[in-house]
Structures are given as structure tokens and as C-alpha cells.
């Protein structure tokens, strides 16, 4: 993605904003070319400056607003607007919900899966709390010009924005992040330097259980042996509600934030979260939704649309720590969960024991390979739930699903574009009964939704 290259010689231009883009930016036109302007809203007339030119579009910077939208609200004070994760914070919450319903409708129109005009796309379900809802903070730390900074990178750049406050994070996780920064400064712990590619602490991850208040800290480091890291961890353990400190080791060439190796320095191996009466142990790398209160809504919708019966076998694909399968275990004969990450499978098995679930089994491997094997073994695959990453389902998996043909399945998606694209192939054999958007991340354009598909009888 192209980095902003601001040209001071560019003149100010006046643009009327027509709509919002998929990333929450305002979209207008200048000399018949589309221009994206972050921070601008539909029906606003704005003064902007072109900061980057591409063959088919322009990138703009908002200078000032000439005619303001009635849907505009005050952006949180004391926060740099350039920070990621607040792309819609200037838009009223009811309009954010409309925008997220519009996102999936636009994606369906773009890819037009079979009979998409007939799809029932419901209104977005709002979250109970539009602020301070994220129970996991993952801040980058760096040392530059004689002082340390802790926060998030500006989109598409390596410019770290210091964050004394991030209004979507819980107060407790933010406080722990800031206290750890103070300890790093006080103890002179080495901070990784991306300019010189030197070892040290790169990222601080803090996750808090909504159910118990327990806090789990992971220090993500470049290199394994960081001087006085254990001393730092011992001080972190004294902070309120902190029950464990881990080190995750990665390398500069790894494009992901987390590396593959995690070791416990002090405390508990897991923290425990609770959803719909079930308990889940979470190790540092285990995936879990970032908005615990709204997770209850998301999973309740998924279970509602699965409409399970006691004689069914449910396949929980992309099972993670077993959340959905364990929640559904009371309603079916058997649950078989499939997950590619070994640590997550161990967590899922432990979560079964924790909840006294005896009809669920979790196996490590790829869904594309294991589904046909299960069918060949005589396992009745009549219900399925998939909760894939943003990339959606692979074509190989879709081909497998069209061969195995579970009678009904629910697709939990975090990307309307890949959902719509996948429905193009899936709609050859399945009818889409309903798409229910659920707002998991207010103030951002991030989308989540539950889709119910039923096998067409004449196929």
C-alpha cells in the first residue's frame, strides 16, 4: 500500500463528499477521478489537499470543512485523529450502524451471488457500549530522540502515535500498558529498534478477562535474551489484577506481530473468560473476540440460526479455543472441532474438561483435508459452522463443502467482501436465508456478521 507523500506544492481543492468507502474514508470526485479523504462525511463540502496520486484514484487530506454533515459528532479529545482504530469516531453511532449494513449490501451488489437481491440483510445489532469495549490492548513501543513512546502506528506508516488514552480500550488495560512503559524506562530495559534491527521489547500485549478481571501480559521481543526481562516481569506481576507475564519471541523478518514461541515468565498459564454460562481458558496466543459483551450477542445469533437438533453432528471449523462448539454442545449429539493451531486445540480440549463437555472432540489440521476424511469414516456432517479469518474460505474448502454438502451451516464473517465473494460459489448449492450484521467494533469500519445457508433441495 502506498505511503502518504504530502506535496506542499499541491493547491487546496473543494470536494463534495458522495459516500463512505470501505475503510470509512469520505469519497468524492476531482476532475472525474475518485478521491479518498479520511475524516470527511457524506454530503459535506470540504477543503482538501491531494497527498498522493495514483493512475485511477487520488488520496486526499482534509484541510477544513465548509459545509458540515448533521451526522458529524465531536472526535475524542486528546487523541491524534491519524491513529488507527477510530476511523468512524466522527460519525454518529446510529449512522455507523447504517454504514455497516450498507457495507454488506454493497459487497453483494459488487459480486452478485445467485439471487442476492432476495437476501434478507437485517439491520446491524448495536453493541451495549460504543466506548471502552476492547479488553485487549496491543501497543508498540519504540525509543526515538532520547525518549520512549508507546501506542499505535498511523495507518500505512511506521510513525508511532503516543497514546496516553485510547477511548475504545478498557481503562484497566490502558493503565497497565502505561505502567509497564514506566517500568521499562525506570529499569532501562532494551527496546527494539526497527531502524537498526536491534533486539529488545517491540510490543506489549495486555488482555483482561471480562468475567474475572484477571490481566495477562505478554512482552513481544525481538530476540530471546533481553537483559533484566525477568526483573521487569517480576515488577509487572505486582500491578493490580496482573496474574501472568509471558514472553513471545519473534524476528524482524516476521510480518506478523506475534512469533511462534511463547514462554511463561511468571504466574498462571491462562486467564478465564465466560460466555453464555461457559468458561474458556485463554493462553496468550489464543484468539478471542475483543468485545466480550457483544460476543455474547454474536454467538447467540450464530446458535439461533444454526437451529440445531439433538440428533445432529456439528462440525466447528476454524474452532479456535472451542468457543462456538462448546456453546452448542448441549444442543447436539456430537461436536467435532477442527483447528490448525496446535496450542488452540490444546486450549479447546482443556475448555471441554473445564465445562464438563463429553460430546466434543477437537482435532488439529486443515478443514479442507479433514472434512472428506470424516465423511469417509461415516461421520454424518449435517451441521457446520465456519468462522474464518478476514481472507474468507479458500476455494479448496468451498469445493470440499460443495462435495460434503452439510444440510445447514452458519458462516461467521469478519469481512463483507470475502463473504460476498464466497457466496458466489456457495450459492450454487445453498440458499442464503439471512445475513445479520453485528457491530463488534464501534468507531471503526470493521464488520462482523452471521449468515445462515441451507442446502437447496433440488441439488
Curated annotation (Swiss-Prot):
One of its GO terms (molecular function) is rRNA (uridine-C5-)-methyltransferase activity. Coiled coil: none annotated. SUPFAM superfamilies: Nucleic acid-binding proteins, S-adenosyl-L-methionine-dependent methyltransferases. The keyword S-adenosyl-L-methionine applies. Belongs to the class I-like SAM-binding methyltransferase superfamily. RNA M5U methyltransferase family. S-adenosyl-L-methionine binds at residues 289, 318, 339, 387. CDD domains: AdoMet_MTases. It holds the Pfam family TRAM. GO terms for biological process: rRNA base methylation. Keywords: Methyltransferase, S-adenosyl-L-methionine, Transferase. Residues 6-64 form the TRAM domain. This is Uncharacterized RNA methyltransferase LJ_1606. The active site is at 414 (nucleophile). Its EC number is 2.1.1.-. It is an enzyme of class 2 (transferase).
